[in-house]
Amino acid sequence: MPVPEPYPPCWTWLPLPRGEVAEPLARRWLGERLGCPPEELSLPRDDHGRPQLGGRFARWDGNWSHSGAGLLVALGRDVRLGIDLEWVRPRPRAMELARRFFTASEADAIANLPPAQREPAFLRLWCAKEAVLKAHGRGLAFGLDKFEFEISDTGICLVRCDAALGDPAQWSLRELGPQPGYVGAMAWRPE
C-alpha cells in the first residue's frame, strides 16, 4: 500500500472506553495510515516523553489525545504536530484558570464575551494552546502564557510566541468538532 502524504495533517476520532490505554489504539490507526503493522511501528519517546515516529517513518509525526470516552489521533509528514481533545462539561473556574494561565489579553478577551460564551471560548483556547504545546513537545510546564492567540469570529490565530516556538506565522491551527460534546484542536508547523 502506498504511504499517504496528507497535508494539512489528517486526524481521526476513535471511541476509547474510559480507563483504557490510548496508545495501542493510536498505534493501530497510525500503522493503518502508514501501511505498517502496528507492532512494527517504532514509537520511541523523546527526553520529555513525547512519542515520535521512527525508522522509515522518521519524516512523519503522529500525536494523540484522549478525554472522556474519545481519542483523537493525528498524522502529518514533514511537520511537527500536536492535537488536543477536551470533553465539554461545566467548568465553573474557567475565568479563574484563564486569568492564572493565559496571557492578560487572552483572559480579557474571554471576560469581555457574553457570560454564556465564556466557557466555550476558554475551552477552545485551552485546546489550541495544548495542541501547540504538544507539538512543541514540552507540555504544560513550558507555560501557557508564553504564546498568545487572538480569538475572532473566524477562528483562533497565533499572534505572538516565545522564540523557542519559532515564528508565529509558521504555525497552523485547525479547530475540531470531532463528536457532539467534544472540542479539539490540531496545531502544526513545518519541520
Q: PLM features: what roles do these ranges have?
A:
Residues 1-191:
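Core catalytic alpha/beta fold that binds nucleotide/phospho-ligands
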